[in-house]
Amino acid sequence: MKVKEEKAGVGKLDHTNHRRRFPDQKECPPIHIGLPVPTYPQRKTDQKGHLSGLQKVHWGLRPDQPQQELTGPGSGASSQDSSMDLISRTRSPAAEQLQDILGEEDEAPNPTLFTEMDTLQHDGDQMEWKESARWIKFEEKVEEGGERWSKPHVSTLSLHSLFELRTCLQTGTVLLDLDSGSLPQIIDDVIEKQIEDGLLRPELRERVSYVLLRRHRHQTKKPIHRSLADIGKSVSTTNRSPARSPGAGPSLHHSTEDLRMRQSANYGRLCHAQSRSMNDISLTPNTDQRKNKFMKKIPKDSEASNVLVGEVDFLDQPFIAFVRLIQSAMLGGVTEVPVPTRFLFILLGPSGRAKSYNEIGRAIATLMVDDLFSDVAYKARNREDLIAGIDEFLDEVIVLPPGEWDPNIRIEPPKKVPSADKRKSVFSLAELGQMNGSVGGGGGAPGGGNGGGGGGGSGGGAGSGGAGGTSSGDDGEMPAMHEIGEELIWTGRFFGGLCLDIKRKLPWFPSDFYDGFHIQSISAILFIYLGCITNAITFGGLLGDATDNYQGVMESFLGTAMAGSLFCLFSGQPLIILSSTGPILIFEKLLFDFSKGNGLDYMEFRLWIGLHSAVQCLILVATDASFIIKYITRFTEEGFSTLISFIFIYDAIKKMIGAFKYYPINMDFKPNFITTYKCECVAPDTVNTTVFNASAPLAPDTNASLYNLLNLTALDWSLLSKKECLSYGGRLLGNSCKFIPDLALMSFILFFGTYSMTLTLKKFKFSRYFPTKVRALVADFSIVFSILMFCGIDACFGLETPKLHVPSVIKPTRPDRGWFVAPFGKNPWWVYPASILPALLVTILIFMDQQITAVIVNRKENKLKKAAGYHLDLFWVGILMALCSFMGLPWYVAATVISIAHIDSLKMETETSAPGEQPQFLGVREQRVTGIIVFILTGISVFLAPILKCIPLPVLYGVFLYMGVASLNGIQMGTGGSEFKIQKKLTPFWERCKLFLMPAKHQPDHAFLRHVPLRRIHLFTLVQILCLAVLWILKSTVAAIIFPVMILGLIIVRRLLDFIFSQHDLAWIDNILPEKEKKETDKKRKRKKGAHEDCDEEPQFPPPSVIKIPMESVQSDPQNGIHCIARKRSSSWSYSL
């Protein structure tokens, strides 16, 4: 058996050592202590009092260092030199020790720890261990009634319990890498070590072993109907529980006295073998453990940490042990769930201090689930490593004043838990302990003697010195710089960026397919498919109106299917969805009007513009022109994304208003005059054989055409429908011909109902109803459920609401054009070179639209693991543009709104999360399968016409509205699990717009509001709103032809903002431009270098693991330079004590 044995370092538990620690001397250095002591030197009776009943130790004192070296009166000058050496160190010994322990970052992460605390319960002459609390991330307690678990909550610990825990680890038995596989063997080894160190009398071996091997009763689900005997037994157990309130003291005393009398003989007769035979713990997990549903909350490959605390009457001093097994082992029924145990903490103490023992147990249990301390516990080499871990934990502790907070209030788990990476990587005192939400705090403000030195009354004075630190607005930590990936580095080689994109994406190509085989992909396919066909039909119809059906719905369907599937198959970022966009539609309309007004053939002219634009895109790819995207900051992203979102919202509402115009409501309807309302078809005044639509049928079930009729006089005009009447030249006569109130109102119900239901189902994921998987399923398929619901409602009412029109035959919309556009023959020769100029405008539009969307998709907060491919994406957009121009299909570019929706539908979260912990955002399921299937389904949708024609158009308008609103909120992405360091620089446009309507006291606690004046934030937002208004006006007027140039102008406007705002302000509300980043980085490097030189010349910080409380008033010329340190210290200890 290989055991790393640790000496206790301190003898038996008595209080004489404690009294010797405070020698009577008038002028002495500050005393190094481990428990809070009175600040005033005149109250020496308190210094000699009984503090905890546990052994007190010196903080900052190593076991191999004599006590007199720091506190003895005869230490002399060497003591002062030693103190100055400690003070001059800018990092604490605990920090250096932890850096040595956790220095290797390339090691595999340690398993997640499930911690369970059991308390010893007495019931007459019987004893058992009862589960009282458990931890994965947050604490869950067994409620007083014992029937249920409490809600997960943040553990609130008393500072005293942490100090006593530190003492326990210093004085108790610590066994690291113990090679034992069962609980009896572990207990034997622990007891043997205690006897060997003189911490336990040999005659108590069997008694301690008997107690530790009692049965463990876990909090399991009990039946609703229980017998009266069971209820009475539980009540009596509750009354006699040693962990209850002080009012239960007498019954506890009687039970323990009775237990002593009944079992004293048994304890004396037990031998080693008998103690093993009296083991009540099963060696293998029982059925209840295996069927425990709580296992779903525990991550895979987790290990357990068991905490056993209790009081017994035969011990005079506490029995303390901390054990780490060399290999985790199943200890049978010790743990609630079948998880192997790696750590064991035992605390048995004399009777009368059950509450103190429970608090110590809660303290060690909370520490074991702390990310940093758990790593220390796994890698600790000796006792001092564990104590250093506690010291670091205390560095981060925040104390709540007892008069301002009720400790009985359970703190709800935060929605976002700060990462422990910063604590693991940074142990410098200058970057520790950001209190009360201060971000990037600098050093503490110069405090007085009371504030910095802690000479004030109770802890509050100590906190004032460090809390009033200098804001990071002056010289403190700035938000993360605008990171530019290697994809946007200018190579200087011909097609250099494209070649690098291909090299980066080629290794990921196979995984792009098998990563898509997941049930989440099904919901994403259905969602994006409905959005794509809605977009194709809507923009196809608008293109047909704008180009006299040279491009219609059929061309839109086929072009979307062909361009989208090829792009998803070969592009650099397959999560981007290609579609027709509003800017492209505007340009197409202007181009058709120009061609028609100048007698040019529209399709041929468009072909040459498309070819020139494709060549220009390839030139941009060859010269690595995409590197200018690094100048696209959040200012440009927010402006462009907001504009596209507004276009979606505007078009959806405009379509709905159009339904009210086409199916108007009779506002003057009077029920009393209902008999006067009628509408009939009247024959035209002059009837001849000239028909308006010769192929139209006479009636819905009549196939005969009007060519078979000799004249129209034989028609019964009153039997014709509205459409037929108008087609044949008839007139509608009556006062109710224009009013169809049911269709307009029903269309609005379908429109708003689809939007509202989709939004509600999306939010249902964060509700408290139903299990997590059910809520996730409902949220993923919210669009599908909403469409099916309101299609069913429409079918039930049977109203003739406008339905989706899908062509059922694959042929061009105009019969006078084919599927190939000839490049020559219809326009003058000068048109071919002259088309370069409009092609340049198209190229600017394509480049900006494509690359801004790519920047939004490739944001760092989306946590994409596979490389982006800006050059490769633009290459394929150019190729597809030339192909679509030859076939007479619409041009396609990245659709911002649908791409954001695609990202949102493929987000991944942790499958298991600790109770009370929000699911962590893991990233996006990066693959090509969903996009390819979506566009294939779009192409074959022409064969699904019988099904798709049942979908009402108002339902699709509701989907459009949801996509616009969701993308408007999607601009604020980064709230779902991204690191706090990223959150500091996120300044959503919409959130800043809301600040105009909020009083300062009600404004959210955004990080940028702490560092940038509100008037500067408002000015920045007004500039964005002005740019957005200019873009909207240009889009809606005849000046829309320069719309692409104005999008490029957003980058110029952002460049000019450098002359209005400081780089500090822009770093918090936007991003710093690349050349400015370099200057800021150089300045920061110089500042750090200067600060480092200053630290070498003058000490800045004391070690945080040493508490210095001067026992005499601080004089104007203090010894050892303590006064200077008190004014400069910014250690987190000044906040805590």
Curated annotation (Swiss-Prot):
Residues in compartment: Cytoplasmic = 1-521, 588-606, 763-773, 848-866, 909-928, 972-1016, 1058-1137
Q: Any keyword Membrane?
A: yes
**Which InterPro entries has this protein been placed in?**
Band3_cytoplasmic_dom (IPR013769), HCO3_transpt-like_TM_dom (IPR011531), HCO3_transpt_euk (IPR003020), Na/HCO3_transpt (IPR003024), PTrfase/Anion_transptr (IPR016152)
Name the Gene Ontology molecular function terms of this record: monoatomic anion transmembrane transporter activity; sodium:bicarbonate symporter activity; solute:inorganic anion antiporter activity
Please list the tissues where expression of this protein has been recorded.
Answer: Highest expression observed in liver, spleen and testis; moderate expression in the choroid plexus, hippocampus, cerebrum and cerebellum of brain, and in kidney cortex and kidney medulla. Also observed in heart, pancreas, muscle, lung, placenta, stomach and small intestine. Weakest expression seen in peripheral blood lymphocytes, colon, duodenum, jejunum, ileum and skeletal muscle.
Listed name of the protein = Electrogenic sodium bicarbonate cotransporter 4
- Membrane-topology annotation of the record: Multi-pass membrane protein
Highest taxon of the source? Eukaryota
The annotated regions of Polar residues compositional bias extend over: 65-91
Q: Where is this region: Disordered?
A: 1-52, 64-94, 221-255, 438-478, 1079-1137
What this chain does, per the entry, is described as: Mediates sodium- and bicarbonate-dependent electrogenic sodium bicarbonate cotransport, with a Na(+):HCO3(-) stoichiometry varying from 1:2 to 1:3.
| Keywords per UniProt | Anion exchange, Cell membrane, Ion transport, Membrane, Sodium, Sodium transport, Transmembrane, Transmembrane helix, Transport
Stored NCBIfam families: ae (TIGR00834)
Q: What reaction is this protein's catalytic activity?
A: 2 hydrogencarbonate(out) + Na(+)(out) = 2 hydrogencarbonate(in) + Na(+)(in); 3 hydrogencarbonate(out) + Na(+)(out) = 3 hydrogencarbonate(in) + Na(+)(in)
Topological domain (Extracellular) residues are 545-555, 629-742, 796-828, 884-888, 949-953, 1035-1039
- Coarsely, its chief localization is membrane
The UniProt entry, under SUPFAM superfamilies, shows: Phoshotransferase/anion transport protein
Q: Which family does it belong to?
A: Belongs to the anion exchanger (TC 2.A.31) family.
Compartment(s): Apical cell membrane; Basolateral cell membrane
Q: Is Membrane there in the keyword field?
A: yes
Q: Which GO terms describe its cellular component?
A: apical plasma membrane; basolateral plasma membrane; membrane; plasma membrane
